[in-house]
Amino acid sequence: MAYMDVKPTNPYGETAVLLHGKNFCAATWEATISALIDAGYRVVAPDQIGFCKSSKPRIYQYTFQQLAANTRALVRSLGIERVILIGHSTGGMLALRWALTFPGEVSRLALVDPIGLEDWKAKGVPWQRVDAWRMQELKTTVESLRDYERATYYAGSWTPAYRRWVDMLAALFNGPGRDWSATSRTPVGNGDPKASLRTCACTIF
């Protein structure tokens, strides 16, 4: 499991764990990491198993529960027992799953545009099988990534600085093992996330 462990010059005494979304890597947290270490926080930013620089097992349990257990094991191996979790998009759902599974180890939970809090079925979006999502992932191109990011992340605007993130994702989508690694980008979970929020013991932002 690839990760960054960045320690501040003037430590505040707390550790923030940053959990990336489906179309992101730990590297995309660079501005957040800089702000947090300037404020005195130690920062751990992993690439989830199946994503970016981490290993991509062909046969694996790509669930939020498993990814949470992996990340918790990483943090424990670094001697860290209590954390602040910051999760974006898919990483938001992962952060919530971690906080619910290991409640005594999370002091605060920050969810940034997390998935799972909207009832898309009620909005008319049809359910899809995991294998259908996988086939959709396999059709990804540089052009489709750029168009998706421009429309979804940048509200239609675009600057050359954004291209680096498109190239990063394109290398992952089209790299070795692309025929099966798409499975890792379709993590699944059980239960109603909104109901789970009511049972979370930590402070949520």
Report each predicted region and the residues it spans.
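Conserved alpha/beta-hydrolase catalytic His-Asp/Glu region
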Residues: 139-199
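Catalytic His-Asp charge-relay segment
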Residues: 201-205
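Active-site loop/oxyanion-hole signature of alpha/beta-hydrolase fold enzymes
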Residues: 4-7, 38, 45-90, 94, ...
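Active-site micro-motifs of SAM-dependent methyltransferase domains
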Residues: 24, 50, 92, 116-117
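Conserved catalytic-core motifs of eukaryotic protein kinase domains, centered on the activation segment
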Residues: 28-30, 54-60, 120-123
